[in-house]
């Protein structure tokens, strides 16, 4: 039997059998050694090999998937209510003629990604645990508000005032703690802010642990991002730091709905494969969630590899068109590429083909990915979840190029959403696009409450106050305040003396953190290298060339000073994470970052 892309299937099978034999009798270490030797030999012989990509399939096999807990029928019902209320919030905001904007399609594509997190993974801060830290994708804010509405944390008045904040009862467009200080923990808009800030949050959490200022609790930093957002330089500019420092407390979930604001993210390529190679090269563990469980029987029957070949060959622009055109089109243009692939679906109706779901809409596949991500040791994890932009919002909206800009829906589209998600509205009620919240004693609300109680409390939530630091007397700065007495002094020299004075104060010296973007010598801070030590997540494994000097370059795992390299955005992100440590850790810190403003 010929495999697609294989000119000698028998020889291939012999190699695979030999590898399986080594694996069985000599173990994974020997198998990995042999593969590495073959790879090195191939490179030496100039054989072109793409090593950073895995097949366009789910990383976690069906056999490896854990059993999913909870009542999935109930969770599906709750997810439908959240979807509806998120949709209603945006539509009502644009129904009055004010055209306030908002986003329908982003949350529609990622509802399952959030739902599985809220029901099974996101742990809240409480008396016994510091809590996970979650960066929510900005355009998905309506969905988070909709969940809080069902939980009773927000009222219908709040939802009716989405993007109307003047009177104090409104909801901001995007996550921001300044606007909702009890609710949003982190700002994530403009796009690119969430990615870099989440990396440096994880970095600072490890820094504080390594200095013994907070305890190790296996807290996770989750960041929800978009595939289009990955084009922001801030999104991927710091991923090497996460890999280099082995930030296994960091989990990114990239919603790969294949579309950005105007059109496809990579119409002529495959964004999931591109991101996989990028993150694997930076030392991340990559978990791909490409196909939902309805594909599993077809893949199991794909003995020739024809279906897998079609999956590999199809570009993202074509996947988008397949979603728009439906089952009959997919039968001809996708499965019809190879007779063996077409044979796999001969007993499926066009509707059955339509129901072949993407991985990011399958709670079982998403749960498996999250569970695996939470076991990470020594690597950050990125989950690349394939979804449909505007999922469930009718054929007029799903996957079309203009979906991101749609703020209003026709009555027929609303009927489609109602019927698809089994919502309790008649045609007349649909005209008003009403919010819906079951009674307090309903099974849905009881289930939501129980799940959040099991995970420590409701989210999002933000601590506004923390322990107080002892403020030093002004006399601490006497040497500076009395002036230079006729001697010339630079402002940077004075600043260094102020920092040095604070670092001598017993009550706060551990909380003062000098941060430099590779400009310590410029500012005259090199004396702190040896005195404080430069933080290095993995310690110092070399002897610096200036070891014999008093102010030598000393790195240490418990180093006090942050040297972020030529990286002002990273230094500012580290400063923000430390400055808000009072909220995230109940640990006030005093970060001191001298920003070289002439280049800012």
Regions from the language model: what does each represent?
Residues 2-151, 417, 488-505, 509, ...:
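N-terminal amphipathic, basic-rich helices that act as targeting or association modules
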Residues 5-9, 24-28, 68, 72-76, ...:
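Hydrophobic alpha-helical scaffolding
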Residues 6, 256-486:
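Long, well-ordered, tryptophan-enriched scaffold segments
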Residues 21, 102-105, 131-134, 220-222, ...:
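Beta-sheet entry/capping signal
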Residues 64-86, 107, 122-125, 132-133, ...:
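Non-catalytic terminal/interface segments that mediate subunit docking, oligomerization
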Residues 66-82, 86-98, 103-245, 268-269, ...:
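Cofactor-binding active-site loop characterized by glycine-rich and histidine/acidic residues
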Residues 138-142, 165-166, 222-232, 255-260, ...:
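Acidic, glycine-rich active-site loops and adjacent beta-strand->loop/helix elements
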Residues 243-251, 257, 281:
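Boundary/activation segment at the start of structured domains
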């Amino acid at each position: 039997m010929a495999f697609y892309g294989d000119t000698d299937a028998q020889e291939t099978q012999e190699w695979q059998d030999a590898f399986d034999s080594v694996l069985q009798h000599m173990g994974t270490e020997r198998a990995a050694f042999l593969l590495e030797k073959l790879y090195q030999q191939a490179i030496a012989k100039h054989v072109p090999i793409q090593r950073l990509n895995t097949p366009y399939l789910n990383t976690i096999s069906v056999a490896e998937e854990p059993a999913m807990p909870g009542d999935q029928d109930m969770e599906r019902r709750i997810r439908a209510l959240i979807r509806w209320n998120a949709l209603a919030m945006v539509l009502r905001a644009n129904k009055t003629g004010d055209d306030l904007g908002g986003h329908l399609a982003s949350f529609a594509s990622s509802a399952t990604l959030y739902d599985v997190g809220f029901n099974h993974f996101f742990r809240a801060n409480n008396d016994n645990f510091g809590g996970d830290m979650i960066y929510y994708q900005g355009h998905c804010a309506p969905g988070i508000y909709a969940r809080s509405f069902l939980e009773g944390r927000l009222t219908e008045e709040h939802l009716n005032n989405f993007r109307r904040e003047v009177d104090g009862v409104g909801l901001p467009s995007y996550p921001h703690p300044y606007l909702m200080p009890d609710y949003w923990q982190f700002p994530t808009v403009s796009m690119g802010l969430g990615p870099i800030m989440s990396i440096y949050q994880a970095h600072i959490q490890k820094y504080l642990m390594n200095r013994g200022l907070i305890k190790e609790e296996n807290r996770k930093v989750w960041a929800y991002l978009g595939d289009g957002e990955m084009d922001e330089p801030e999104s991927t500019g710091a991923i090497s730091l996460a890999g280099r420092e082995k930030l296994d407390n960091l989990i990114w979930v990239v919603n790969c709905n294949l579309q950005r604001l105007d059109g496809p993210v990579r119409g002529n390529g495959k964004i999931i494969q591109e991101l996989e190679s990028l993150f694997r090269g930076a030392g991340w563990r990559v978990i791909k969630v490409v196909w939902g469980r309805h594909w599993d029987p077809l893949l199991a029957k794909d003995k020739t590899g024809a279906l897998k070949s079609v999956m590999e060959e199809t570009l993202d622009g074509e996947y988008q068109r397949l979603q728009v055109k439906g089952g009959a089109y997919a039968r001809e243009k996708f499965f019809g590429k190879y007779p063996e692939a077409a044979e796999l679906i001969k007993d499926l109706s066009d509707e059955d083909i339509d129901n072949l779901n993407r991985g990011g809409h399958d709670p079982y596949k998403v749960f498996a990915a999250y569970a695996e991500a939470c076991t990470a040791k020594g690597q950050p994890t990125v989950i690349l979840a394939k979804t449909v932009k505007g999922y469930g919002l009718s054929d007029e909206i799903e996957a079309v190029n203009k979906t991101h800009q749609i703020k209003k829906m026709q009555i027929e589209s609303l009927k489609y959403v109602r019927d698809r998600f089994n919502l309790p509205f008649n045609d007349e009620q649909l005209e008003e696009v009403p919010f819906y919240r079951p009674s307090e004693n309903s099974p849905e609300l009881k289930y939501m409450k129980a799940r959040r109680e099991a995970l420590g409390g409701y989210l999002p939530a933000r601590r506004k106050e923390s322990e107080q630091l002892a403020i030093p007397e002004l006399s601490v700065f006497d040497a500076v305040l009395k002036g230079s007495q006729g001697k010339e002094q630079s402002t940077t020299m004075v600043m260094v003396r102020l920092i040095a004075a604070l670092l001598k104060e017993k009550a706060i010296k551990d909380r003062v953190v000098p941060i430099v973007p590779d400009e310590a010598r410029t500012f005259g801070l090199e004396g702190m290298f040896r005195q404080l030590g430069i933080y290095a997540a993995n310690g110092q494994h070399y002897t610096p060339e200036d070891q014999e000097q008093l102010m030598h370059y000393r790195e240490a795992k418990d180093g006090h000073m942050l040297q972020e390299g030529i990286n002002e955005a990273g230094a500012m992100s580290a400063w923000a994470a430390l400055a808000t440590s009072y909220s995230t850790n109940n640990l006030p810190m005093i970060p001191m970052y001298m920003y070289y403003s002439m280049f800012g």
